[in-house]
Amino acid sequence: DRGVLNAFDKLGFKYVYDPNITGFTGKFSASGHCIIVRREEDDCIYHELGHFVAWIAGNVDYQREWEAIYDKEKSKVTFYNKGYVTQNPREYFADAYKDYVLHRSSLSSTRPLTYKYVKAAVAKVNSMTSADFEKMHKMYDAIWNKYDA
């Protein structure tokens, strides 16, 4: 989504490809100011962007409403990494964002509450203004500068 990528850029986040990382396929780090992935050809980047969306939209993956949706619709996940994706509401949101980007109509029809919630989070990010980005910079630049140095 263009608004998500714009926010990623405006906040100065970095995308890092590192085939030598171990222990994970991808990782979003708000404090580290980056997304790291092990395989460029993998759709993992969308999952990690999902963590970014949840964070920038106000940690929406920690809200009670989201946890209720997670409890209600996680059993409808049928793909190969179901165990990982459904282990907690945060991973479920990140993967739901991936599905929102790559398989929107399928997500909408099979997990409609999930779809609506992710869509609302994306809309929040899309509506962010320069003032919102400036506010986030004021809040986080000290942390980001520590990690970026």
Model-derived features: positions:
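Active-site-flanking segments in enzyme catalytic domains
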Residues: 1-148
